[in-house]
């Protein structure tokens, strides 16, 4: 049985101007849709006060968005292969707007149903993972750069939406802000999905031209599903520390006496730095491979999150937030590059969303765990410390996979030159 060790010789590229048009349209859609989990982050304390409950209860709503998005990506990825990305993404936009409307009604259960089921499972679940798979099918040589571009939608959203949400919540309240954002989702995403998205190249044609790994091959000398399981476990571990500052930075700053506007600005700085460095990480993944790029990014994230334990002044936290953004931004796209390098294109519709489900479950668990630890201890240091622990666990798993890949490549090279 063949083994996937080194990348095969690539035939003429499938990439074209249409490939980058598809990537730019996806970037625009994700720049809007990625705002949905940020509204609860920015409005964590006002929503908590309005509903009269614990912080972990509200943080769970944000966590449910990630779990729903991950699980929905598997279901909607399967559906997108059958009815087309245009229709699944349009369904996602409508469900996201409906979820925001339900969440704004002012009860904890409405918040959970709106965020977990409608915004997460049926909303972002129909948009994020299916669009990522859609874009990977337009590229074979610069897939890492393309994924870096579209994933920057998260950081464009992070630059724009926190300040908009903070001002909207201050002036009009969190419920009105949710409804206004729902209107923006419908007004922008629906026309883009219905009128502009075009079918990707046929999977079999892309497979033949790009030298995809063959179905049934072992991966890194192991069963293919075992390798995917290890990648998913690593993703779960690395997304736990990723979620702590992403989900609690504004509330963390408020607890330290830093103005909410400055906390929202700090989150924007974090995501702006992530946006600026994202293309570097994409080029690195194209050059050294997805797994090695993941390991470098995860090591940078571990160093940066440790900084949140070492400083509590505003200037220092701005610097640490910037460093964290620069470090973590390339990790998730590099995982996708690794999966597309190691597995056939025909399996991308379920392998990539499965990875996203575990990664987003890690984001959900990390966001909820940070809120729970805060409720128990009354401050955020334990949450950041636990984040460092899981980051080290991630590095152990990824280090094992990189070692297997290096060993496998050496064996293939020795066989080829014998």
Q: What feature does the model see in each segment?
A:
Residues 40-44, 225-279:
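Extracytoplasmic gate region of multi-pass secondary transporters
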Residues 47-48, 79-80, 160-172, 253-254, ...:
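Interfacial helix-cap and linker-helix signal at transmembrane-aqueous boundaries
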Residues 141, 149-201:
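Helix-loop-helix hairpin linking two adjacent transmembrane segments in secondary transporters
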Residues 21-55, 73-76, 161-162, 245-250:
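Extracytoplasmic
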């Amino acid at each position: 049985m063949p083994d996937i060790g080194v990348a095969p010789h690539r035939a003429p590229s499938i990439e074209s101007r249409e490939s980058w048009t598809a990537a730019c349209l996806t970037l625009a859609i994700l720049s809007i849709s990625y705002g949905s989990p940020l509204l609860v982050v920015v409005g964590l304390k006002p929503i908590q006060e309005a509903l009269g409950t614990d912080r972990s209860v509200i943080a769970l709503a944000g966590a449910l968005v990630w779990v729903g998005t991950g699980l929905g990506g598997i279901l909607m990825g399967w559906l997108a292969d059958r009815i087309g990305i245009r229709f699944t993404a349009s369904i996602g936009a409508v469900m996201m707007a409906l979820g925001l409307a339900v969440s704004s009604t002012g009860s904890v259960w409405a918040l959970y149903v709106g965020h977990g089921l409608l915004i997460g499972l049926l909303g972002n679940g129909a948009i994020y993972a299916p669009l990522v798979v859609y874009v990977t099918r337009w590229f074979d040589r610069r897939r890492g750069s393309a994924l870096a571009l579209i994933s920057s939608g998260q950081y464009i959203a992070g630059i724009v939406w926190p300040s908009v949400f903070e001002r909207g919540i201050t002036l009009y309240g969190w419920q009105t802000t949710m409804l206004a954002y729902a209107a923006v989702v419908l007004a922008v995403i629906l026309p883009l999905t219905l009128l502009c998205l075009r079918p990707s190249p046929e999977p079999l044609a892309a497979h033949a031209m790009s030298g995809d790994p063959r179905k049934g091959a072992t991966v890194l000398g192991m069963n293919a599903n075992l390798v995917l399981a290890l990648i998913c476990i690593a993703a779960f571990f690395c997304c736990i520390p990723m979620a702590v500052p992403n989900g609690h930075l504004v509330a963390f700053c408020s607890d330290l006496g830093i103005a909410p506007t400055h906390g929202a600005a700090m989150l924007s700085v974090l995501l702006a730095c992530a946006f600026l460095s994202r293309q570097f990480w994409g080029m690195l993944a194209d050059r050294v491979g997805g797994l090695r790029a993941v390991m470098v990014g995860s090591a940078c994230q571990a160093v940066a999150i440790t900084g949140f334990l070492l400083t509590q002044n505003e200037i220092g936290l701005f610097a640490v937030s910037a460093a964290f953004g620069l470090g973590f931004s390339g990790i998730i796209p590099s995982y996708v590059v690794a999966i597309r390098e190691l597995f056939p294109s025909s399996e991308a519709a379920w392998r990539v969303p499965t990875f996203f489900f575990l990664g987003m479950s890690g984001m959900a668990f990390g966001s909820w765990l940070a809120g729970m630890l805060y409720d128990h201890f009354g401050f955020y240091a334990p949450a950041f410390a636990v984040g460092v622990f899981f980051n080290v666990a991630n590095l152990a798993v990824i280090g094992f996979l990189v070692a297997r890949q290096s060993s496998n490549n050496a064996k293939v090279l020795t066989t080829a030159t014998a």
